[in-house]
């Protein structure tokens, strides 16, 4: 699996806007009182892995099963269920790419910077291409969950609907909110810092 991901990241051709030219995201609600900007890079990566990646997989599966149950009685949720199924499948693939390829190298960059050392370049020369891939995935998920929000009338169940209907919509909103925190931390803090360290702590010949 890891060899396949390395080959994919090394050969993919991208033409996205550079990371620093993108429109910045506003800090999401779940994290508005947490000073992530002051955290060290290794702590941020650890938080993403142990909180966001774990919970994306755990609660994504839980919510999908709840959706299947409610959708079996309320077929207007068919499209929502399809979108969410595709989301958790794509997010699992996305997280795996980060865990197996990108984040280990970012941690190496952090350790090199802490020890004032230099390390060899990423296997495809720079981490900019895989970072742009990850950010493109983020954009896709934000668009997908915006569509879910629209399809559910801003996560509002029809009048008189069973409690389980509103409960699953509340869970969908919570999932989106924490996904936005996950994306914000990576887009606005982790990736820019990693690129800055790469500029100063990677051997160039």
Roles of regions detected by a PLM:
Residues 1-205:
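Small-residue-biased structural context
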């Amino acid at each position: 699996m890891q060899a396949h991901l390395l080959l994919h990241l090394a050969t993919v051709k991208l033409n996205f806007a550079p990371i620093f030219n993108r429109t910045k995201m506003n800090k999401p609600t779940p994290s508005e009182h947490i000073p992530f900007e002051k955290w060290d890079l290794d702590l941020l990566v650890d938080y993403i892995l142990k909180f966001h990646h774990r919970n994306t997989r755990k609660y994504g599966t839980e919510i999908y099963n709840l959706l299947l149950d409610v959708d079996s009685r309320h077929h207007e949720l068919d499209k929502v269920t399809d979108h969410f199924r595709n989301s958790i499948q794509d997010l699992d693939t996305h997280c795996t790419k980060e865990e197996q390829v990108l984040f280990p190298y970012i941690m190496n960059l952090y350790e090199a910077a802490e020890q004032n050392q230099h390390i060899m370049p990423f296997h495809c020369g720079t981490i900019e291409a895989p970072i742009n891939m990850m950010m493109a995935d983020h954009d896709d998920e934000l668009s997908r969950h915006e569509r879910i929000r629209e399809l559910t009338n801003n996560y509002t169940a029809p009048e008189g609907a069973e409690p389980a209907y509103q409960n699953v919509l509340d869970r969908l909103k919570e999932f989106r909110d924490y996904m936005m925190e996950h994306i914000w931390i990576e887009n606005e803090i982790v990736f820019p810092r990693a690129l800055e360290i790469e500029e100063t702590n990677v051997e160039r010949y």
